């Protein structure tokens, strides 16, 4: 591997090595002041920390003939998580992706993240690696194949986390992004009603939902239904709403199975995200669609499909995967033109304007080697869709499927990916989370699910799993007798942990009169509650007739401390 040979490089390398190995200072991976933004700055922020060296030299990299190294010989420790950040800009191109790669001495390269860099201003490149070995690595920056590209890099930082430190940071973020401090203020007619009164708080519906996919087998098994409805309040159907399932023969629609599953969900207050209005992969079209060669004919049947399925379920879904996997594939673009996806989303928004319309892809958060669907490329595709004329008010969404390999997940890369996907400010969902069976499947799945839950951009998770009878062979949550597997125990644990337990709190005694002097005001202690809908009941053991019930929603928008006022007619 070629190295810089100009004189100042060795001094800069020494200073940056001190910075990386000594200070541990970097862009905080759990601070979202900048990580969810995509502004390009005229000057990168400068650290005020004592780093032991300048650490802010501008490294000018000509990506030509392999001259791209920035830092050599950084020692990693197996099991630790390393977050790396840098500010980058281009000097001879207007816009180009710039990526960060970690190179091991055995020749293996691990992609750490990338950013869409621009000429003349600085973009934050944030990524990292979860070490599955101990030993030295080199860090280098590169672009997407343009020889002679000139890249400037400043403020390279790396921070190491032990797993326990990472988990602690996750828990602290969860307190900020998933919970609010709440204080109840109650107005009573008389003091005797105030004294001894108790507030009972019961969560009816959490804002964040951990759901699970279902398939047609749930209609054939009472035990599967009972198992499912006792746990989950969010689902999507694996195949039953897809075009090949509802119109296997041209002109002969059959929604019987999808309708029955929809009825089951609605009867049990289970929310449904619609999965796949259209699929951009030719392989998964109905067989009769594959034979169509006339673009006008394909356009007509496509419009019929969209009108049929979206009107049928309008008002009954909480979102739609509109053009499934349209970063990996381009069947409709090849047949109908390059703007096919944008036009489809435009039509979908007119058919159902009140729900988010998702771009749903695989390998974006779970597999760093599939650069076709890198987070930057997914964001670019969504930007193309919403920037199409007339699409600026579309309610967009990003679906990251999350089919993880049976190895230690790269949580540093996953966090970078979620940061990037979240930069559009659309809701991000993990939509099909599973993992092939392996000895550490439960441990790895817990790492993945907690990583998603602790990220502010992620609004929901749907598992691709179920009991053995359901046929989900990767993430099996219960055996043939519906006894939990270890993976099932994990999911039950998280469902319980991410749901607010019922709680009772007293009304504090330091009451005072209101401004008119006609009522007595009491306050509850502050309490931390998960976001969601609650049933709040005020009772007094000494007053049998006092039992007043209220509905309260705890939301992020209410600020750090949410004041809830209740008027008690006693």
Swiss-Prot record:
Reading the lineage from the top rank, the first entry is: Eukaryota
Q: Sorted alphabetically, which keywords does the UniProt record give?
A: Carbohydrate metabolism, Glycoprotein, Glycosidase, Hydrolase, Polysaccharide degradation, Repeat, Signal, Xylan degradation
Q: Which Pfam families match?
A: Glyco_hydro_10
Phosphoprotein found in the keyword field: no
EC numbers listed for it are 3.2.1.8
Q: In which pathway does it act?
A: Glycan degradation; xylan degradation
Signal peptide feature range: 1-24
Q: Which residues form the GH10 domain?
A: 195-494
Which reaction is the catalytic activity of this chain?
Answer: Endohydrolysis of (1->4)-beta-D-xylosidic linkages in xylans
Uppermost EC category: hydrolase
Reply yes or no: does the keyword Repeat apply. Answer: yes
GO MF annotation: an example: endo-1,4-beta-xylanase activity
Q: Which residues form the active site?
A: 325 (proton donor), 432 (nucleophile)
Q: What SUPFAM superfamilies does its record include?
A: (Trans)glycosidases
Q: Which residues are glycosylated?
A: 92, 190, 300, 339, 545
Picking any one GO biological process from the record gives:
xylan catabolic process
- Domains: what does the record tell us? The GH10 domain binds to xylan.
| Recorded family membership | Belongs to the glycosyl hydrolase 10 (cellulase F) family.
The task this protein performs is described as: Binds to and hydrolyzes insoluble and soluble xylan substrates.
Q: What is this protein called?
A: Endo-1,4-beta-xylanase 4
Give the organism the record lists.
Arabidopsis thaliana
